[in-house]
């Protein structure tokens, strides 16, 4: 008695426009494109239902729990300006739906199933509001921006990096030689490419040994602390941690992980190891464009960036901004702030749908990488500020005099731009002149 089987509209249960969100709710903003004939309210309610407690029909066991306590709620829907049949659906999820400290569970719940739903032509997760009650259950960055600067004894400027090229094919000894040339030229870091793991031409243990030799030799010559992002990504978590242990035993200061291909569970495991053992953790976002490139379907990178800050990483690649449209610049700087700052106000012009309070969670260094060179230095210095890593691959190796002179050119340009900025010069207007003066 009281149970009535059958299919009913999702909006009768999961669309609640009068709902007042709680401080402990996880809030999501979805860009949805309903199928023709599907009302926006039904589509939004379907998203809330299928990513929380709902299924396609009423079930007897609904009566054995409190749906009001556990269900997701679509509490607001707004049309997207300038787009036909696109809406932003706001969904609130009770905190008890999620396992503490697990990005894996968070993503499995919110985006694990609903993206293939028939009522929707397309769906994109634009933003998440993570309440402090949930974010405090995560490890966060193993060390964060300030501790990294203290470890490196480097302040008042962006850090400089370089990816070793060719990314595949070098022997371990030649690879180590390239690392040494860059670091002695003035870079702070060099980097394994994301797809350098342990291939037949260069096994990981050989690479780690020759890179460690290059690190210590360049440190002795320059008097500066140097690092190389030793990619610990592997086919199993056990093998990944074995590589991280070997890096620590060699005295390396930093390791690297491909967090999307490696997975959030592996990434969080590595972050715990890095915090416990004093290793910095560099994160590459390989595979991100598969997820975030389409404007109306997938997951925006700002969500992946927030997830990484919770899962754990001290650096993450975040695009370059340089040469892009102004609107994209603002959106990129929006998620750069979400990586670095403690408190970020809602600002739709920057793509930030919710105010995010990270409380005391350490910040992550954004890494500008990809197609940049020394003449971009003034713009990069102005846009990203000091708390960033500027990574020049071809922009270092492509120097006509070789690797070390390429590194010298980048370091000289960076220090000239920082000094000019500190003297009050306008880098946006005078940047090229600053770099030319530094060439003399």
UniProtKB/Swiss-Prot annotation:
Any single GO CC term annotated in Swiss-Prot or TrEMBL for this entry: chloroplast
Cofactor comment: Binds 1 Mg(2+) ion per subunit.
GO molecular function: magnesium ion binding; monooxygenase activity; ribulose-bisphosphate carboxylase activity
UniProt-listed InterPro entries: RuBisCO, RuBisCo_large_chain_AS, RuBisCO_lsu_C, RuBisCO_lsu_C_sf, RuBisCO_lsu_fd_N, RuBisCO_lsu_N_sf, RuBisCO_lsuI
Post-translational modifications reported in the UniProt record: The disulfide bond which can form in the large chain dimeric partners within the hexadecamer appears to be associated with oxidative stress and protein turnover.
Annotated site residues (Transition state stabilizer) in this chain: 324
Subcellular locations according to the entry: Plastid, Chloroplast
Enzyme class: lyase
Major subcellular location class: plastid
Keyword list, A-Z: Calvin cycle, Carbon dioxide fixation, Chloroplast, Disulfide bond, Lyase, Magnesium, Metal-binding, Methylation, Monooxygenase, Oxidoreductase, Photorespiration, Photosynthesis, Plastid
Necessary cofactors: Mg(2+)
Modified residues (N6,N6,N6-trimethyllysine): 4
The EC number(s) this enzyme carries: 4.1.1.39
Binding site for substrate: 113, 163, 167, 285, 317, 369
Pfam families reported for this sequence: RuBisCO_large, RuBisCO_large_N
Modification type N6-carboxylysine: residues: 191
Binding site for Mg(2+): 191, 193-194
Gene Ontology biological process terms in this record: photorespiration; reductive pentose-phosphate cycle
Protein family per UniProt: Belongs to the RuBisCO large chain family. Type I subfamily.
Subunit structure and binding partners: Heterohexadecamer of 8 large chains and 8 small chains; disulfide-linked. The disulfide link is formed within the large subunit homodimers.
Leftover remarks: The basic functional RuBisCO is composed of a large chain homodimer in a 'head-to-tail' conformation. In form I RuBisCO this homodimer is arranged in a barrel-like tetramer with the small subunits forming a tetrameric 'cap' on each end of the 'barrel'.
Name used for this protein in its record: Ribulose bisphosphate carboxylase large chain
Taxonomic lineage from the root: Eukaryota, Viridiplantae, Streptophyta, Embryophyta, Tracheophyta
Gene: rbcL
């Amino acid at each position: 008695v009281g149970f009535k089987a059958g299919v009913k509209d999702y909006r009768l249960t999961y669309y609640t426009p009068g709902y007042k969100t709680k401080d402990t709710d996880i809030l999501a903003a979805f860009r949805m494109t309903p199928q023709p004939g599907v009302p926006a309210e039904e589509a939004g309610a379907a998203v809330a239902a299928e990513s929380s407690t709902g299924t396609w029909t009423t079930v007897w066991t609904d009566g054995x729990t409190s749906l009001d306590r556990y269900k997701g709620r679509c509490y607001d829907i707004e049309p997207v300006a300038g787009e036909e049949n696109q809406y932003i659906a706001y969904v609130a999820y009770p905190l008890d739906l999620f396992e503490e400290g697990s990005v894996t569970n968070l993503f499995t719940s919110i985006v694990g199933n609903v993206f293939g739903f028939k009522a929707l032509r397309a769906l994109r997760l634009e933003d998440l509001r993570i309440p402090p009650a949930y974010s405090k259950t995560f490890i966060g960055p193993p060390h964060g921006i300030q501790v990294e600067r203290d470890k490196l004894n480097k302040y008042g400027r962006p850090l400089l990096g370089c990816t070793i090229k060719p990314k595949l094919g070098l022997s371990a000894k030649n690879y180590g030689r390239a690392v040494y040339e860059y670091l002695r030229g003035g870079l702070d870091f060099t980097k394994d490419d994301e797809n350098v793991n342990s291939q037949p031409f260069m096994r990981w243990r050989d690479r780690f040994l020759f890179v460690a030799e290059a690190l210590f030799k360049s440190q002795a010559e320059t008097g500066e602390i140097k690092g190389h992002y030793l990619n610990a990504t592997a086919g199993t978590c056990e093998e990944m941690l074995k590589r991280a242990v070997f890096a620590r035993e060699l005295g390396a200061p930093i390791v690297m992980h491909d967090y999307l291909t490696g997975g959030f569970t592996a990434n969080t495991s590595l972050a715990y190891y890095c915090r416990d053992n004093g290793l910095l953790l560099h994160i590459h976002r390989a595979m991100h464009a598969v997820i975030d490139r389409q404007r109306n379907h997938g997951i925006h990178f700002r969500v992946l960036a927030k997830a990484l800050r919770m899962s754990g990483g001290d650096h993450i690649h975040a695009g370059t901004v340089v040469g892009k449209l102004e609107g994209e610049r603002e959106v990129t700087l929006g998620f750069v702030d979400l990586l670095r700052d403690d408190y970020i106000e809602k600002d739709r012009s920057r793509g930030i749908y919710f105010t995010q309070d990270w409380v005391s969670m350490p910040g992550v260094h954004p890494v500008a990488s990809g197609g940049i060179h020394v003449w971009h230095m003034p713009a990069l210095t102005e846009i990203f500020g000091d708390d960033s890593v500027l990574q020049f691959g071809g922009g270092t190796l492509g120097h006509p005099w070789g690797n070390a002179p390429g590194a010298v050119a980048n370091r000289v340009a960076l220090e000239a731009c920082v000094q000019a900025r500190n003297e009050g010069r306008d880098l946006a207007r005078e940047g090229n002149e600053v770099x030319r003066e530094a060439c003399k």
